[in-house]
Amino acid sequence: MEQHPLLTDIKYLNVPNICFSLTEETDNREPIYSEQRQLRGFDDSETWSLTDTICLFILPRLQRFKEINASTPAQLTEKEWNDILDKIIISLQLTCKDRGLRIWTEEESKQINEGLDLFREWFMALWW
């Protein structure tokens, strides 16, 4: 017996932070996107604003990483590392705060750029 698509489609499992689909259940493309999610775990709508999709995926994981992280890069103090992580987290929060509108103050733009530069610089240190 075949399961109803809503029972096998990750979008409708009510599990947070695993599906970033931008379609509504009533969207006429939803059957196609549902099939994509079942086949590969995401649908094409997640690429409409990949910036937001990536931010929404990384942000809660980075916040949790900071909470449970058991190490610090050798050249940094714990405070320095936490300050770097905070700046990266703030940049991601600001980047995805308006769901793609990209309306930031000059100060917010500076914070985003600083945090993303730090993310690039310290990306390989995000492990423990």
Model-inferred region functions:
Residues 1-128:
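Long, non-globular targeting/processing and low-complexity regions
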